[in-house]
Amino acid sequence: MKNAVHFGAGNIGRGFIGKLLADAEVEVTFADVDAPLVDQLSHKQEYKVKVVGTECQIDTVTHVTAVNSASEDVIDRIVKTDLVTTAVGPNVLDIIAKTIATGIAKRFAAGNDKPLNIIACENMVRGTTHLKGEVYKHLDESLHSKADELVGFVDSAVDRIVPPAEAANDDPLEVTVESFSEWIVDEQQFKGEIPDIAGMEKTNNLMAFVERKLFTLNTGHCITAYLGCLKGHRTIREAIEDPSIHAEVKQAMQESGEVLIKRYGFDRDMHNAYIEKILGRFANPYLVDEVDRVGRQPIRKLGANDRLVKPLLGTIEYGTENKTLLKGIAAALKYTNDTDPQAVEQQNSLKEVGVKKTLATYTGLAENSAEVTQIETLYNQL
């Protein structure tokens, strides 16, 4: 395998997926709508990644280029490529689906019958399966059976904290990432040969890993942010080093962890060690990760399949403790940020219809449920 088209040349794209692909000697073409970024990447054809942890190192990623994702160039690349990956954010998948569909149709028309694998690397459950549904809406029905045969839509779970670049840095392409990374793919969904990429782990039980990451890293991260905001902390590190927040975030992750242990049979001691590792990652002194970055888009994060309500539904299913998860949801409702449209919309909803109706709308929980009543009580105490 030689070539990949990666949608999304942002920090995750460059600092995580693009880097792993390039390290595996894959030639990566980034596709993005940010014209200055595309120009710089296509001109320099390399960038630096600062990996920070107990030891810091700077790696140079080479053999990369970039095209505008709204251009014909990206479609021509899809015709010939071996792999398509994305790190664009869940909301943008629907936008790029048409481009991918056009590329697949043109690929078939050009007589390229080699398998093509597509992996969406997003913070969403079964994101690639969602993308497939959107791509097929734009793909002529006569091509669906051929696409079923030749195009693998491979779901994945991804985990690496990549904060925005520091404003003081004069290299706009440099990106800072933590040393930890996890990219797990569903080996059952590939077509043809599975690419050999160091750092890409294969599993036949992806949902266990998707939910482990969602219920632990994502749940803990956003509760750290929302509790941190309430106490005036600016960064995730400041918030998690506050003893009361640390204790509550750990408790919330243990509550969601109980669901994982019951659902997937995870070993309790190993899962507790995973929780401790994540708490350590939040406290990484080399990562400046602002609570507003982690807390933004609260409406999406309160969705029934997302990081707060999905583990809560699991605790209801198994009859296990959930008081700290409920507090995390109450804290999410308290989140204010004038620059985030979802935060503004949420605050307007709370003013207009109150806590219970807002919760029912965003979470799908019944307005008269015990959980919604408890969240309202906690909200009024915060």
Swiss-Prot record:
Repressor is among the record's keywords: no
Annotated transmembrane regions: none
InterPro entries assigned to the protein according to its UniProt record, in alphabetical order: 6-PGluconate_DH-like_C_sf, 6PGD_dom2, Mannitol_1_phos_5_DH, Mannitol_DH, Mannitol_DH_C, Mannitol_DH_CS, Mannitol_DH_N, NAD(P)-bd_dom_sf
Gene Ontology biological-process entries: mannitol catabolic process
Record-level Gene Ontology MF annotations: mannitol-1-phosphate 5-dehydrogenase activity
Pfam (any one): Mannitol_dh_C
Domain of life: Bacteria
Keywords: NAD, Oxidoreductase
Record: residues binding NAD(+): 4-15
Enzyme Commission no: 1.1.1.17
PROSITE patterns associated with the record: MANNITOL_DHGENASE
GO cellular component, one term: cytosol
Catalytic activity as recorded in UniProt: D-mannitol 1-phosphate + NAD(+) = beta-D-fructose 6-phosphate + NADH + H(+)
NCBIfam families registered for this protein in UniProt: PRK02318.1-2 (NF002646), PRK02318.1-3 (NF002647), PRK02318.2-2 (NF002650), PRK02318.2-5 (NF002652)
Sequence similarity: Belongs to the mannitol dehydrogenase family.
Protein name according to UniProt: Mannitol-1-phosphate 5-dehydrogenase
Taxonomic source organism: Vibrio campbellii (strain ATCC BAA-1116)
